[in-house]
């Protein structure tokens, strides 16, 4: 018995293997049902929209209407939908779209802060300090230093009795100040500066041994060295050294006259010619101090004053007869002892420092304000 052919052998498509449905016509005859072939042409969009879109179950439902397309933005709108802020009369709010596609109003932006002023730095620190004042000229600074040194020197020698009672500490301080002044000498050629060198100079301190006898007399009781001076005449090339010693009874003055020759811009050679003794000036009245200091002991002079009171008339007559006498002049022999040299190491309008024969002389010009400190 022959086997029937397999079901799938003659069928070219699986759909052909299914039994063919039949459609009963009104005449009672049956005719085969054929599936309509799918058209290769797509239906119009309107027809597809009218027929609906099949869902996953094959049912068709009307599709949601698509929103109308928005027209292109005008040329004055940017890509974010914001109006041109420069357009006049634009009062509607500016809308923006966030990341979820929802419209919103942008947050107001704070205005940027103004640039800091020019005197503040970028870290907000203190303003830069003003520029320093212009430097003081070096000449002014040196002049102020000299004036201060001169005042210190006069204060140091005050009360030393021209150096006779100066202690070792005072002498050392004086030498230090003198050295500093000599280093800042404003007159490098003092002998040539005749307008400064000429005049009467008052001695305020000395370390010259030959003046010690005179200073010792001034340190004795009832005696005082009033003044030791040196007058320089650059026209006649002469020097006059004068000293005055006073007491309650009389005052005594003597001097020595010398000529000088210029040896260098700062050194002169002195040749003494004669000595002169002025007549003593007798006091018309004797005024003794209440007490004197002799070797550390105070001695009262009251009894001596009582003895001298009856003699006041006699002193007055003696003073009148002597005051008219000429000075006594004595020549000084021209030997080596009458010669000396004088080196001026500092000179200005007020102060002169000289060295000679191993001695130191500090002199202030007559009329200088420095004398008011003594």
From Swiss-Prot:
Q: Where in the sequence does UniProt note compositional bias of the Low complexity kind?
A: 28-54
Report the GO terms under cellular component. Answer: chloroplast
Q: Where found in the cell?
A: Plastid, Chloroplast
Report the sequence similarity comment from the record.
Belongs to the PAP/fibrillin family.
This chain's protein is named Probable plastid-lipid-associated protein 3, chloroplastic
Organism of origin is Oryza sativa subsp. japonica
What are the record keywords, sorted? Answer: Chloroplast, Plastid, Transit peptide
Write down the Pfam families for this protein, in alphabetical order: PAP_fibrillin
**Transit peptide stretch:** 1-46
Where are stretches of biased composition, namely Pro residues?
64-73, 127-136
Name the segments for region: Disordered.
19-148
Keyword Chloroplast among record annotations: yes
């Amino acid at each position: 018995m022959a086997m029937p052919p397999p079901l799938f052998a003659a069928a070219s498509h699986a759909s052909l293997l299914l039994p063919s449905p039949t459609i009963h016509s009104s005449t009672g005859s049956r005719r085969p049902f054929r599936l309509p072939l799918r058209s290769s042409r797509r239906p119009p969009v309107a027809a597809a929209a009218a027929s609906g879109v099949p869902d996953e179950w094959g049912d068709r439902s009307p599709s949601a209407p698509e929103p109308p397309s928005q027209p292109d933005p005008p040329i004055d709108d940017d890509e974010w939908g914001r109006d041109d802020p420069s357009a006049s009369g634009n009062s509607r709010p500016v809308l923006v779209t966030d990341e979820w596609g929802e419209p919103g109003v942008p947050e107001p932006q704070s205005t940027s802060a103004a640039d800091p002023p020019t005197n503040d730095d970028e870290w907000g620190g203190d303003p830069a300090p003003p520029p320093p004042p212009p430097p003081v000229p070096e000449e002014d600074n040196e002049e102020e230093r000299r004036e201060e040194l001169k005042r210190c020197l006069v204060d140091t020698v005050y009360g030393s009795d021209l150096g006779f009672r100066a202690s070792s500490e005072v002498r050392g301080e004086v030498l230090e100040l003198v050295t500093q002044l000599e280093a800042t000498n404003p007159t490098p050629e003092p002998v040539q500066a005749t307008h400064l060198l000429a005049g009467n100079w008052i001695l305020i301190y000395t370390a010259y041994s030959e003046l010690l006898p005179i200073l010792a007399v001034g340190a004795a009781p009832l005696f005082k060295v009033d003044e030791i001076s040196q007058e320089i005449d650059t026209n006649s090339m002469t020097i006059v050294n004068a000293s005055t010693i006073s007491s309650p009874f009389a005052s005594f003055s003597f001097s020595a006259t010398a000529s000088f020759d210029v040896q260098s811009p700062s050194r002169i050679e002195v040749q003494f010619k004669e000595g002169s003794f002025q007549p003593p000036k007798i006091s018309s009245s004797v005024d003794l101090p209440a007490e004197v200091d002799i070797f550390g002991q105070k001695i009262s002079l009251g009894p001596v004053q009582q003895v001298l009171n009856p003699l006041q008339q006699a002193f007055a007559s003696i003073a009148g007869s002597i005051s008219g006498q000429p000075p006594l002049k004595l020549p000084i022999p021209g030997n080596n002892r009458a010669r000396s040299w004088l080196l001026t190491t500092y000179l200005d309008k007020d102060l002169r420092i000289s060295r000679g024969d191993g001695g130191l002389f500090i002199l202030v010009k007559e009329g200088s304000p420095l004398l008011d400190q003594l």
